Amino acid sequence: MSEPEIKAVLSKINWDTPLSTDDLYLVFTEAKQQIGGIDKKWLYTRILNSFNWYTVMKIIPREEWPYLLSDKIIDNLFPRQLRNKYKHVRSALFE
């Protein structure tokens, strides 16, 4: 996805933070490790909670999927059914 497309997606998950979409993009691209308590773990959790898997696949580069689908991220998802869904996705892709 292009930078404007990614920023459009990030703007949809940024409804409750004082940060700008540009700040989130810096964390997303790892130009900054953390801004105001927002890190990549927070972004990935929010993306998985907000979008379907097909949208997630377009946003997150494939080489990031092992981290995206790690327990560190999945354990923060809500509701439990969503956690189970992404555990099944992980097992289908990596096991």
What are the residue ranges of the model-derived segments?
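Long, compositionally biased intrinsically disordered regulatory segments in eukaryotic proteins
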Residues: 1-95
